Amino acid sequence: MVAQIHYHKNSKLSIRRNKKGSGFLYINKNGKPVSGARSSRISKLVIPPGWHDVLVSADPKNYIQAVGMDAKGRKQYIYHPLWVKKNQERKFDQMVDFGERLPTLREAVKANMRDRTLTRDRIVATIVWLLEHTFIRVGNKTYAKDNQSYGLTTMREKHVDIKGNKVTFSFEGKSGVFHELGVSHPKIAQTIRECMDIPGYELFTYFDEDKNKRVVDSSDVNEYLKTHTGMDFSAKDFRTWGGSVLAGDSLYKKGNATTETDLKKNITDVVAIVSTHLGNTKKVCRTYYIHPTIIKSYEENILVPHYARSYSRKSSGGISLTSEEYATWSLIKDS
């Protein structure tokens, strides 16, 4: 059960890995090699041999089981499988609520993007718009510092180029993946241009009422989301929502498969489409960013007729979503 999971971030990471011959030796906090069940548990974690500065949790139920630095100097984590499973289920479970509240959030974003002065809300609204339209991760300071990889809130001025209304982002994201993508929007371009007029390397900055320079971070984004939705959504929910909507519509366009071979091929093709848009591997996309109802309903020949009925309707049930979004939302809601 999830109640068994413990939440010690660093205090329980007391086992270190030392090189020994062609293998490794794990040493506890008393300087003695681990053995027995603890040694067996560590082996099952399959910690990459290329990691260095590896620390392992002494608690088999800790949500973080191991940390280490990869070959590029990026901090990596191995989490308890029960924690991963529950965290993912919770994220998928809130997709219906996310869809219901998305129109209200969009109205707030639209209004704040029209602010005449460079306020915190105007910048956060700009970031939220970019989250939805580019699928760029929100980023966090710790990850940027440890791994030299970036997201929207940790972006630097050197990562951005503006020509007229077009903004191009070029940066290294999570797992060392290089991203280059652009958007064309006058208000987005203007806000970023004004941010870049403020001295400093951080991109999303502003001056508060006391003329103090402030840097917008991921906590500002999550606070904004809660203010305008009333729920604890995070920037990651945009990627799950976007990946699920794209997968559902793409499978609908494939039509019902007539053979098992076609079924597998269609699903594989669509997962690849989502993978390209999100910048993740196919395995990660299918596991974490496509709601399981999408794949399951396609396999059961439910998805295509559902989308066909939904697209033929004149109304979206009083919810201001696009036709693709409403079809996806209602499929998940009714599952």
What positions do the PLM features span?
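A positively charged, amphipathic N-terminal helix/segment that binds anionic biomolecules
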Residues: 1-150, 154-267, 271-278, 285-287, ...
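Acidic, low-complexity interaction regions
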Residues: 261-335
